[in-house]
């Protein structure tokens, strides 16, 4: 059936455009004109090939994939520029100003006071930023990201404000001289920068939900380690181990791409040798002869580093718990009392011994390269001035021992402060001192050996202690890339594996301790009392649901009470058979749809005759004449037939689900609308598809009776058109009342924008809790619906499950 020639307003992205419809236009072609191409579901091309929607989705997928790689390249490039700039500020501004500040006087006592004042002032400023401006910038940032990547999205952790204040806070805290690092904040900054870029228009489409956004942020975390140590491969592995529980292989390539782009950017920016911040870590060892004595020494070093790592974590936990129970003690002094006390103590202990007040990069360089003949030998042999008879290696043994003890305690205390901090670099320096300590002992035991190099032991110790504390084997790859030397590859791997194994036997990693202390949700921490716990024991029985046959008032009241993104749909209140789930956004659109119908029914209805241009004044006069003379008994049969057909077109325009594409809808959530012109005239919309009769025939929830009556009376020449229009409006008013029953399943069949997920995650009441936890971790869902023979009996929410566990422990 073809439509007669008439003008129609077609919904488009920029409003309504006038389209002339020819006489031979079929209803199916007219439907394709009215409906947006991307929203036509199930319509095949004339050649019987792939549907138009499938083609558009294929193009969208290719474009989306291109934007993903473009986004990763942008993060790698911009992140490398940003982080290198921060490093240069540390080198040429913060540390230079500190030396200049201390050189204002040659008096030792005044220099001592200047060093204390500098440390206290910068640490207090960093604490002020955290407490008063941006609390989300506190700490390492890795535990928060770990919680996000496990499925608990927290937008405040990666907000754009965090990017700025985390950087400023880190400049103050790290520049103060506290025993902290910067790799954790660098990873956090990389993720925050990535999330900020995702808010830019070209990249909005690639992060359509929290899960996809989290995957992209996880891929960008490798940039932080690549910028800190110049280690793209180790950075990727570390980001996987430190922030992930289960990892997608597709994200593996993205992380490598981001880290590679970042590494290239860093190499270009630091091409000037004077700006190469990593050159001091390069080593050049002679070939290693792994004899039995040295092999045993490396094994002992790995075990020792594992024990020290566990001791460090236990010390941190005890200090944190003590501060938590005595928080009022510090508040009585000053809001920043704990920071002032720790900063002052750090400065007092560090200044007297030169090697203790070195920044961590210089300390590591000294441990890796200092020999009796090197230029920096006096740094670690400073204790030898106590006696002229003390050999170099005896002095350095004592220096390393003091460095390990003091730095281990200061680091454990410093990471309990409310400031931005990292943990990897100070552990790196402490581990190098432990390795150097063992190497110097080996040299004392075997003074005639020409194959023992204490500096090589320092490299192994640095990797082993970091691996034991963070439980990351990637520490081995980071140290090998950092030193650019594979001579000690086997001892490094051996030490890291032994250290991680010893640590796992004794306690959790330092990042897991951060997670627990901050009470962050994290599924792997969930521990059931016994394997006998099943879904019935932990499910929530107080249910919110919507019945298949419901009313607008019931939907409105339900939306006011629930916070979930989706609501289960059941057959009825009696049997509670689970049909599926529907999003709260869709329910809001259902209400908005009926409100639109209500508003249109109240507006004056005017009808355009077939073949009349609605923007033509003459044609508008004809329309008005038709309306004003509807009751004229002298009208000919053609006019009566035309007017009666117009009435049916009004009903059909309201009945059919014509989607309007609004410019104000940023999310492109298409809500049904009836096209009208500027004079509130409903435009004719005879768009029944003969090949898809169900689309129009099933659309009878609101004015089906009126529609049929108009069709039956279509050839009646004596119909009063004004009365028909009024009857249409009255029927619409009745159909959209708040107590009118709405069949959601029927609406889904009739409207492509109403989507009911007919296969939500369902579990039986007898499923063990350990399996439920595993499902949450692997599938990434938020809610599991508990059913018994299809009947909805409860829900298990991931967030509530974790919060219950945190409250118990």
Curated annotation (Swiss-Prot):
Keywords: CBS domain, Chloride, Chloride channel, Ion channel, Ion transport, Membrane, Repeat, Transmembrane, Transmembrane helix, Transport, Voltage-gated channel
Similarity remark: Belongs to the chloride channel (TC 2.A.49) family.
Subcellular location: Membrane
Record-level GO cellular component terms: chloride channel complex
UniProt biased composition (Low complexity): 620-646
Sequence ranges assigned to domain CBS in this UniProt record: 539-597, 756-809
CDD domains for the chain: ClC_1_like
Ranges of the Cytoplasmic topological domain: 1-65
Membrane disposition: Multi-pass membrane protein
One GO term (biological process): chloride transport
Function: Voltage-gated chloride channel. Chloride channels may have several functions including the regulation of cell volume, membrane potential stabilization and signal transduction.
GO MF term (any one): voltage-gated chloride channel activity
Region annotation Disordered: where it falls in the sequence: 604-646, 692-729
Protein name per the record: Chloride channel protein F
Pfam families found in the cross-reference section: CBS (PF00571), Voltage_CLC (PF00654)
Segments passing through the bilayer: 66-86, 110-130, 152-172, 218-238, 246-266, 295-315, 333-353, 395-415, 425-445, 459-479, 486-506
């Amino acid at each position: 059936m073809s439509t007669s020639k008439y003008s129609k307003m077609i919904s488009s992205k920029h409003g309504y455009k006038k389209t002339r419809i020819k006489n031979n236009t079929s209803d199916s072609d007219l439907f394709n004109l009215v409906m947006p191409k991307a929203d036509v579901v199930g319509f095949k091309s004339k050649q019987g090939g792939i549907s138009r929607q499938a083609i558009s989705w294929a193009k969208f997928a290719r474009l989306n994939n291109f934007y993903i790689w473009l986004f990763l390249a942008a993060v790698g490039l911009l992140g490398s520029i940003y982080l290198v700039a921060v490093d240069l500020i540390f080198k040429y501004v913060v540390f230079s100003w500190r030396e200049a500040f201390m050189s204002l006087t040659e008096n030792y006592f005044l220099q001592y006071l200047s060093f204390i004042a500098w440390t206290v002032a910068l640490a207090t400023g960093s604490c002020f930023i955290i407490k008063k401006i941006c609390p989300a910038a506190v700490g390492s940032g890795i535990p928060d990201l770990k919680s996000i990547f496990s499925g608990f999205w927290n937008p405040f952790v990666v907000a754009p404000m965090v990017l700025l204040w985390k950087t400023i806070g880190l400049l103050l805290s790290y520049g103060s001289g506290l025993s902290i690092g910067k790799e954790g904040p660098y990873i956090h900054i990389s993720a925050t920068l990535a999330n900020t870029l995702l808010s830019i228009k070209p990249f909005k489409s690639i992060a359509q939900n929290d899960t996809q956004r989290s995957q992209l942020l996880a891929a960008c975390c490798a940039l932080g380690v690549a910028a800190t140590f110049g280690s793209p491969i180790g950075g990727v592995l570390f980001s996987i181990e430190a922030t992930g529980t289960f990892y997608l292989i597709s994200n593996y390539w993205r992380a490598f791409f981001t880290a590679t782009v970042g590494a290239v950017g860093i190499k270009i920016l630091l091409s000037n040798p004077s700006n190469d911040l990593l050159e001091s870590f390069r080593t050049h060892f002679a070939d290693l002869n792994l004899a039995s004595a040295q092999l045993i020494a490396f094994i002992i070093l790995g075990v020792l580093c594992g024990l020290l790592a566990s001791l460090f974590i236990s010390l941190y936990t005890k200090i944190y718990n003590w501060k938590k129970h005595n928080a009022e003690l510090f508040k009585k002094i000053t809001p920043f009392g704990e920071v002032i006390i720790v900063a002052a103590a750090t400065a007092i202990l560090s200044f007297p011994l030169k090697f203790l007040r070195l920044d961590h990069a210089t300390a590591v360089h000294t441990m890796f390269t200092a020999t009796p003949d090197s230029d920096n030998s006096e740094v670690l042999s400073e204790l030898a001035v106590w006696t002229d008879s003390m050999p170099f290696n005896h002095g350095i043994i004592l220096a390393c021992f003091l460095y390990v003890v003091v730095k281990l305690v200061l680091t454990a205390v410093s990471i309990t402060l409310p400031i931005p901090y990292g943990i990897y670099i100070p552990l790196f320096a402490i581990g190098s001192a432990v390795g150097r300590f063992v190497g110097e002992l080996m040299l004392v035991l075997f003074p005639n050996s020409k194959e023992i190099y204490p500096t090589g032991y320092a490299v192994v110790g640095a990797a082993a202690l970091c691996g034991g504390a963070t439980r990351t084997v990637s520490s081995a790859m980071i140290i090998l890339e950092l030193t650019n030397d594979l001579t000690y590859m086997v001892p490094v791997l051996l030490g890291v594996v032994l250290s991680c194994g010893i640590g796992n036997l004794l306690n959790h990693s330092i990042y897991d301790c951060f997670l627990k202390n901050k009470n962050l949700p994290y599924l792997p921490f969930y521990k059931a009392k016994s394997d006998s716990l099943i879904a019935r024991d932990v499910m929530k029985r107080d249910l919110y649901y919507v019945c298949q046959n419901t009313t607008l008032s019931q939907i409105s009241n339900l939306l006011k009470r629930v916070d979930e993104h989706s609501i289960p749909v059941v057959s009825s209140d009696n049997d509670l058979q689970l049909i599926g789930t529907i999003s709260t956004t869709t329910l809001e659109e259902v209400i908005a749809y009926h409100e639109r119908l209500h508003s249109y029914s109240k507006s004056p209805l005017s009808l355009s005759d077939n073949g009349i241009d609605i923007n033509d004044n003459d044609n508008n006069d004809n329309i008005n004449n038709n309306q004003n003379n509807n009751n004229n008994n002298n009208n000919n049969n053609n006019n009566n037939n035309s007017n009666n057909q117009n009435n049916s077109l009004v009903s059909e325009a309201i009945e059919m689900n014509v989607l309007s594409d609004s410019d104000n809808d940023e999310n492109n959530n298409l809500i049904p609308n009836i096209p009208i012109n500027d004079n509130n005239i409903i435009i004719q919309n005879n768009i029944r598809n003969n090949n898809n009769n169900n689309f129009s025939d099933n659309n009878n929830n609101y004015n089906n009776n009126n529609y049929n009556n108009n069709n039956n009376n279509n050839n009646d020449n004596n119909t009063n058109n004004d009365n028909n229009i009024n009857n249409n409006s009255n029927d619409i008013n009745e159909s959209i009342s708040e107590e009118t029953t709405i069949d959601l399943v029927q609406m889904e069949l009739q409207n492509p924008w109403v989507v009911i997920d007919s296969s939500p995650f369902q579990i039986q009441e007898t499923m063990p809790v350990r399996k439920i936890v595993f499902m949450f971790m692997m599938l990434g869902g938020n809610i599991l619906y508990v059913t018994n023979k299809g009947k909805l009996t409860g829900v298990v929410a991931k967030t509530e499950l974790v919060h219950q566990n945190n409250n118990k422990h």
